[in-house]
Amino acid sequence: MNHSEALTEQVFSFASELYAYGVREVVISPGSRSTPLALVFEAHPNIKTWIHPDERSAAFFALGLIKGSEKPVAILCTSGTAAANYTPAIAESQISRLPLVVLTSDRPHELRSVGAPQAINQVNMFSNYVNFQFDLPIADGSEHTIDTINYQMQIASQYLYGPHRGPIHFNLPFREPLTPDLDRVDLLTSVTKTLPHYQKSISVDDIKDILQEKNGLIIVGDMQHQAVDQILTYSTIYDLPILADPLSQLRKEKHPNVITTYDLLYRAGLNLEVDYVIRVGKPVISKKLNQWLKKTDAYQIIVQNNDQIDVFPTPPHISYEISANDFFRSLMEEPLVERKKWLQQWQSLEQQARIEISDYLKHATDEAAYVGSLIQKLTKEDTLFVGNSMPIRDVDNLLFDSEASVYANRGANGIDGVVSTALGMAAHKNVTLLIGDLSFYHDMNGLLMAKLNELHINIVLVNNNGGGIFSYLPQKRSATKYFERLFGTPTGLNFEYTALLYDFTFKRFDNLTDFKYAELSKMGSHMYEVITNRDENLHQHQNLYQKLSEIVNVTL
């Protein structure tokens, strides 16, 4: 078997194995060393390829594809520093447990560590962030090479689904010439293989006594596409309030036991005595709720469908590695407890807080008012993707009367890659992106995917000319002299030119009334810039906090 035949057999087999374990989309960043796989993916009849010249943005775009399709997605790049640009998205995928398949092309072994161009040490280069990594052998025509691909793909497949989900990395060295025989498409298969299946039942004997206490809470974070119907059923039967993070997707159910205003209530001084807490899913966004969890004496139970339990903000008394539905189904035989008054107390606080927030939004002109207006425009067909820092916090506080789905990059919580991830989701969903100006600037090149692929997306860009969240931190008061340069970081950019560069329509709003009457587009790529003031935003938010503290004090 000559080199061309060996290369052809190897890359066609590898692509077929990826398909067999569920990969249907690949994001390719063009380069020479990745030629063999790029050509094969393009030739595969049942794998869709996306082309993005920027590796960092491409990797985040793939995360959006994963969120939108609920399937593993692969990324492919050439050798050298191109691969290093994947790191931020891989870190996000690891913490968010997204099945990202990282494929880095490499120089052959004889060109490593000898000063050859475009060659860095790529073996295990993402070891801190991936669940699996393997440096594949070079194509040599040996049957052992194909066996190795099959064995390692089977091992890696356990990380594409189920509780061990997360990123995997294959490093693939290729020797020149790099072109496989594309006439051998008969080697490409579209056969699916049996995927790992996880099914668990548990004993709840250890928490039976705790569950008989009256003052219980269920706190639900990002559920990452898990079914949640049993949480609502259990809450209804046992009269337990559910403090639901916007990423839990529970708020859109409009269930009477779902509490949405808890962040503002705890910020206002809420301090009800709680006997136990069942924490489900990822940690919540709310800093105030996390601070309360850290200091409370309540017995804490964590339920996560993953082998790596996220204990933040404080280790629990007991944890269960099981799906939320299976866990709450296991509790259904426990005796009923009288909790009507406990639940009604939370529902009363929620109702009063919503009234106060709604009244606030009628008169406010700050960023929260724009966010509130945007939420009212969304329907159950819409997906709201939210940037980090202030946008996600405003959504956390104001999302209580919408059927839209809500997503964000809340693994590593970075401001990078937000535009790209939202556009990846836009390939599968009707997406509106809410983002701040610094986060938008950080990932403007991600807009290229909308231009190249005619993706539909609405971008609401909140421009306060800097980092608005820092105004809420101690630096604002303790480092006044240096605050604006080090933390405010104004850029003074005119984003209308960005819209022009990437073929987005653009409209700027400097008053809330005009924005309220604006309609989100149903097709095409559109940017809506709203101009806000950081100091005014801080002042109006503080007024809302004061109003809610009065409610809490009167109620308690």
Curated annotation (Swiss-Prot):
Reactions listed under catalytic activity: isochorismate + 2-oxoglutarate + H(+) = 5-enolpyruvoyl-6-hydroxy-2-succinyl-cyclohex-3-ene-1-carboxylate + CO2
Any one Gene Ontology molecular-function term assigned to this protein's record: 2-succinyl-5-enolpyruvyl-6-hydroxy-3-cyclohexene-1-carboxylic-acid synthase activity
Cofactor comment: Binds 1 thiamine pyrophosphate per subunit.
Keyword Metal-binding part of the UniProt annotation: yes
Pfam (any one): TPP_enzyme_N
BP GO annotations: menaquinone biosynthetic process
Main enzyme class: transferase
Pathway of action: Quinol/quinone metabolism; 1,4-dihydroxy-2-naphthoate biosynthesis; 1,4-dihydroxy-2-naphthoate from chorismate: step 2/7; Quinol/quinone metabolism; menaquinone biosynthesis
Keywords of the record: Magnesium, Manganese, Menaquinone biosynthesis, Metal-binding, Thiamine pyrophosphate, Transferase
Cofactor: Mg(2+); Mn(2+); thiamine diphosphate
Cited SUPFAM superfamilies: Thiamin diphosphate-binding fold (THDP-binding)
PANTHER family to which the protein is assigned, alphabetical: 2-SUCCINYL-5-ENOLPYRUVYL-6-HYDROXY-3-CYCLOHEXENE-1-CARBOXYLATE SYNTHASE, PROTEIN PHYLLO, CHLOROPLASTIC
Similarity section: Belongs to the TPP enzyme family. MenD subfamily.
HAMAP family recorded: MenD
Subunit structure: Homodimer.
Function comment: Catalyzes the thiamine diphosphate-dependent decarboxylation of 2-oxoglutarate and the subsequent addition of the resulting succinic semialdehyde-thiamine pyrophosphate anion to isochorismate to yield 2-succinyl-5-enolpyruvyl-6-hydroxy-3-cyclohexene-1-carboxylate (SEPHCHC).
Protein name: 2-succinyl-5-enolpyruvyl-6-hydroxy-3-cyclohexene-1-carboxylate synthase
Species for this entry: Staphylococcus epidermidis (strain ATCC 35984 / DSM 28319 / BCRC 17069 / CCUG 31568 / BM 3577 / RP62A)
